[in-house]
């Protein structure tokens, strides 16, 4: 998710809370969940991997997300950097990838899901990519990861200030696997909310761009607003 400007934070934060509540009701508080098989995260994913070691440059269209970009379950692209083009293969980000901060006390375990279509975008080696095996698992795995940040953080190795999240420990995490009908119904509920979040974000990015374009002209007097009746 692309981080929205403050203008719309409250709306999207409320939508995020709704999504989290729905996930909890369907998959945590639901007594039927005990009947679903317990499986490893590895069995439900096609990729669990750290990102790349980038070579930074301003003269590139390729974007590298870092740990600062992942906060409060949002992805803030404005804090990303550009790097020299390389063949990245499977580490190009895809819609639905779950991103997990993987180094450092206080940041390790933070998670967010890619709910936009990324273009020429990857992550650095301090972030783990978790890719669901299919579209039917996308929202389930993403929201499961976001709701299990503390459990993910507890998997760390190393001493204070040098903590790391081992990939194998992430892959070995266990979760319930709902039946396909339940997943389909859950996706039908979640998808419109996610779509609304993205629409709000895109609108706010557009408004922020207009604001940033107009403000210098207003400050310099290039645009005269003295005759506007309020």
Where are these regions (language model features)?
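Non-catalytic DNA-recognition/assembly elements of restriction-modification systems
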Residues: 2-52, 172, 176, 180-225
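Glycine-anchored helix-breaking recognition loops at helix->coil/strand junctions
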Residues: 12, 67-68, 124-127, 142-204
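Active-site donor-nucleotide binding/catalytic segment of nucleotide-sugar enzymes
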Residues: 31, 60, 65, 161
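Short coil/turn segments at secondary-structure boundaries
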Residues: 37, 54-61, 155-157
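Sequence-specific dsDNA recognition surfaces
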Residues: 42-55, 63, 68-98
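Short beta-strand-to-loop capping motifs
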Residues: 85, 131-132, 175-177
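A short beta-sheet element
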Residues: 89-150, 156-161, 166-170
């Amino acid at each position: 998710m692309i981080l929205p400007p403050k203008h719309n934070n409250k709306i999207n934060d409320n939508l995020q809370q709704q999504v989290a509540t729905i996930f909890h009701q369907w998959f945590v508080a639901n007594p039927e969940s005990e009947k679903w098989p317990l499986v490893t995260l590895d069995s439900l994913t096609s990729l669990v991997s750290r990102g790349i070691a980038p070579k930074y440059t301003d003269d590139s269209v390729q974007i590298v997300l870092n740990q600062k970009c992942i906060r409060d379950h949002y992805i803030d692209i404005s804090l990303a950097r550009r790097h020299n083009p390389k063949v990245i293969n499977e580490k190009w980000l895809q819609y639905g990838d779950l991103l997990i901060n993987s180094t450092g006390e206080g940041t390790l375990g933070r998670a967010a899901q890619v709910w936009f279509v990324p273009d020429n975008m990857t992550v650095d080696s301090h972030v783990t990519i978790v890719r669901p095996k299919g579209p039917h698992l996308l929202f389930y795995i993403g929201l499961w990861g976001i709701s299990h940040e503390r459990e993910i953080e507890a998997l760390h190795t190393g001493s204070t200030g040098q903590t790391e999240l081992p990939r194998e420990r992430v892959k070995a995490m266990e979760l319930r696997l709902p039946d396909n009908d339940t997943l389909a119904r859950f996706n039908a509920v979640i998808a419109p909310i996610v779509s609304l979040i993205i629409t709000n974000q895109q609108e706010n990015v557009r408004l922020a761009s207009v604001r940033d374009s107009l403000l210098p002209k207003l400050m310099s007097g290039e645009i005269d607003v003295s005759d506007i009746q309020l």
